Regions:
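Alpha-helical transmembrane segments of integral membrane proteins
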Residues: 2, 6-10, 39-43, 69-78, ...
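Membrane-helix interface/capping segments
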Residues: 52-71
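Cytoplasmic juxtamembrane regions at transmembrane-helix boundaries
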Residues: 66-74, 78, 140-151
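Hydrophobic cores of alpha-helical transmembrane segments in multi-pass inner/ER membrane proteins
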Residues: 46-51, 130-140
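Hydrophobic alpha-helical transmembrane segments
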Residues: 113-136
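Functional transmembrane-helix hotspots
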Residues: 88-111
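Transmembrane alpha-helical insertion/packing segments
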Residues: 1-58
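Hydrophobic alpha-helical membrane-insertion segments
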Residues: 75-93
Length: 151
């Protein structure tokens, strides 16, 4: 359980630092920026790398054995803790910054949607995106790191 919380918190910290740096220093996530694609690339790369490190540690904890099922389950648990920690960060960030945080969010119909609808969509996207990405990355990493137990 410590491993799951540790690596989930590491991913969330990476994402939080990126968001703070982008919001206050870099400003690359603005819609007119050509570099706005860096944010989703960074989010996915951070999740993949930290999941790899977490699953590698899980394998070493189990005396060098990692089955595909254990790897996927651990990866999903790490991704769930990441989604929860990142959600808590964004709630705190929204409470501190307010609706200025939503300036870069696409709302689909101009700015006609209420902030609450945009927030629910953003949190759902973060939560389910983290879980879906975690599932895909865990499958790939588990196949790469798998070591069958010897009888």
């Amino acid at each position: 359980m410590k491993l799951v919380i540790k690596y989930g918190a590491i991913i969330a910290a990476c994402i939080g630092i990126w968001v703070l740096a982008d919001h206050y220093l870099l400003h690359i996530s603005q819609s007119e920026s050509r570099l706005s694609l860096l944010t989703p690339v960074f989010f996915n790369l951070a999740q993949f790398i930290v999941l790899f490190l977490g699953l590698r540690e899980k394998r070493s904890e189990n005396r060098g054995v990692l089955t595909i099922g254990k790897g996927i389950a651990t990866g999903l648990a790490i991704s769930l803790s990441y989604a929860i920690f990142a959600g808590m960060f964004f709630v705190a960030f929204y409470l501190a910054v307010g609706s200025k945080m939503l300036e870069n969010e696409s709302t689909g119909f101009g700015n006609s949607q209420r902030d609450s609808h945009v927030l629910v969509g953003a949190f759902a996207g973060l939560f389910f995106g983290a879980l879906f990405g975690g599932l895909l990355y865990s499958i790939v990493i588990s196949f790469a790191l798998r070591v069958r137990p010897t009888d």
